[in-house]
From Swiss-Prot:
Listed name of the protein: Uncharacterized protein C28H8.5
Cited SUPFAM superfamilies: Lipocalins (SSF50814)
PANTHER family assigned to the protein according to its UniProt record, in alphabetical order: MARVEL DOMAIN-CONTAINING PROTEIN-RELATED (PTHR15854:SF2), THAP4 PROTEIN (PTHR15854)
Disulfide linkage: 80-115, 87-108, 98-112
Length: 302
């Protein structure tokens, strides 16, 4: 039987799976090869070619198309991720829900750790003390490469990158006031490649207290900043959201006086992978409340 004129065959050594897919040595998965035939009447010739040169390859026949083409694809497991923004709070509130509640089991495989690598204990919401369970959605490493926007009448507008880490403090289980560690690092995206140039950083703690008389839950954030200021902020906690208001501000003795009079910091979980942060303030110059920074982070761990 003669081959179609259009089909040109060159002799070559039988390839190994690793030579076909150098990124996957040993090829621990099945390889799919599909061929579109020039002429269906010669399909048996093509099958003979496949059997000769690719004896261990699974193939599928695609009936007549105009051009001859080959393609392969690796069967890779689906990404291990949660599909509901409430997963952290659900699992923190009742860890047994991972096994006993179908909704949690099916939508929260990463938080339940039914797939992927084990989660670092600092980020494992199953280990959260009872007081912190309502803000379990905060826990994680959040990052925006270049999505931060800063604007205010007294400064030029600019864009920045920022990473926020919120983890379980080491001694949270042993203290009367369990805490989350909070760190934030912002950098100038306009600098040359290399180590990012810091423009601002913050380090502090997050705590939760329930007011029985008012039947409200309050969240506090106290921070020390790289510009020499220290702040204490408090606010009410809501479902996947908290709005802090500045209560106290201090500074080192040789730092300039703060012009901030009122400040609000809002954190809102938009979905299972995105956290929005906004900061609004009024100063001795502006006199009215205005937005100062806004950024949407992507969750990069766990």
């Amino acid at each position: 039987m003669r081959l179609p004129r259009r089909l040109k065959i060159k002799r070559f050594h039988k390839p190994s799976c690793s030579s076909i897919l150098p990124k996957y040595p040993g090829c621990p998965f099945s390889l799919n090869l599909s061929l579109s035939f020039l002429n269906f009447t010669h399909y048996d010739v093509h099958l003979q070619m496949i059997n000769r040169f690719f004896p261990n390859v699974y193939y599928s026949v695609v009936i007549p198309i105009i051009l001859l083409s080959t393609s392969y694809s690796a069967k890779i497991a689906p990404k291990c991720r949660d599909t509901d923004m409430n997963c952290a709070v659900w699992v923190a509130t009742n860890t047994s829900d991972c096994e006993n509640v179908e909704l949690v089991n099916s939508h929260c495989p990463r938080t339940c750790q039914t797939c992927g690598e084990p989660i670092d204990p600092k980020y494992d919401v199953k280990l959260l003390p009872a007081k912190l369970k309502s803000i379990a959605w905060m826990v994680g490493r959040w990052r925006s490469e270049f999505g931060g926007k800063a604007f205010f009448p007294t400064i030029p507008k600019f864009t920045y990158g920022e990473q926020v880490d919120i983890t379980i403090a080491d001694n949270s289980q042993d203290t009367h006031t369990p805490l989350l560690n909070y760190t934030a690092f912002a950098w100038d995206i306009n600098m040359p490649d290399g180590d990012p140039t810091e423009i601002h950083s913050e380090n502090g703690y997050i705590a939760v207290e329930y007011d029985k008389e008012q039947e409200k839950e309050y969240v506090s954030l106290n921070t020390a900043m790289s510009n020499g200021f220290m702040t204490i902020e408090e606010g009410e906690s809501g479902p996947n959201q908290v709005k802090f208001r500045l209560q106290r501000i201090g500074r080192i003795s040789f730092s300039h006086d703060s012009a901030v009079r009122i400040m609000f910091r809002e954190w809102t979980l938009l979905d299972e992978n995105r956290l929005e942060a906004r900061l609004l303030m009024t100063t001795t110059i502006t006199r009215r409340l205005m937005e100062h920074t806004a950024v949407i982070y992507k969750k990069i761990y766990p």
